[in-house]
């Protein structure tokens, strides 16, 4: 005859095995889903300033401000296994001193149940766009890309890049502006 503890242990082990099998089934049903979506990006304003750099030996560095529009339909990205999306807009460019520079300019957490159709107008960069030198001034190829990290209830965390990118030229001169 089995004791009460032995029966409880068997029940717990069986329940754990069933839950693991169900979780694996959940992961397999959504693991290979295409989570990409078309994205439209438009930059409406670029401001470039020369500011004091207190982080290093350089006296001044470039600071860029960008105002942009984002339009994307992320409805097909959501399914029953997606808890939220972490969206972020990044800028990628090259300079003489660095072959690849990447800076996150803006981010947003989009929860399940919120409107997955983005139509954002005149959004200002949320984070500073610093370059450690003067790599932004006159740079003709700063590429903005909207990407997102899918946060599932169970499974892997896929990183998805939107299909729309925009390359913008930065001005050849600095502006003196009090507000942006």
Curated annotation (Swiss-Prot):
The keyword Plastid does not apply. The gene is Arxes1. This is Adipocyte-related X-chromosome expressed sequence 1. One of its GO terms (biological process) is signal peptide processing. PANTHER family: ADIPOCYTE-RELATED X-CHROMOSOME EXPRESSED SEQUENCE 1-RELATED, MICROSOMAL SIGNAL PEPTIDASE 23 KD SUBUNIT SPC22/23. It is a single-pass type II membrane protein. Coiled coil: none annotated. The chain crosses the membrane at residues 12-32. GO terms for cellular component: endoplasmic reticulum; signal peptidase complex. InterPro entries: SPC3. It is found in: Endoplasmic reticulum membrane.
């Amino acid at each position: 005859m089995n004791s009460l503890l032995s029966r409880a242990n068997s029940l717990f082990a069986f329940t754990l095995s069933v839950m693991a099998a169900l979780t694996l089934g959940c992961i397999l049903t959504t693991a290979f889903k295409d989570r990409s979506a078309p994205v439209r990006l438009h930059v409406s304003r670029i401001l470039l300033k020369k500011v004091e750099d207190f982080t290093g030996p350089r006296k001044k560095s470039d600071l860029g401000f960008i105002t942009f529009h984002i339009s994307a339909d992320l409805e097909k990205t959501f399914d029953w296994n997606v808890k939220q999306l972490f969206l972020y807009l990044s800028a990628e460019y090259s300079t003489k001193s660095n072959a690849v520079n990447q800076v996150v300019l803006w981010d947003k957490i989009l929860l399940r149940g919120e409107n997955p159709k983005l139509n954002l107008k005149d959004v200002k960069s949320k984070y500073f766009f610093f370059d450690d030198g003067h790599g932004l001034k006159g740079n003709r190829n700063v590429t903005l890309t909207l990407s997102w990290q899918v946060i599932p209830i169970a499974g892997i965390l896929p990183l998805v890049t939107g299909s729309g990118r925009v390359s913008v030229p930065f001005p050849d001169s600095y502006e003196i502006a009090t507000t942006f």
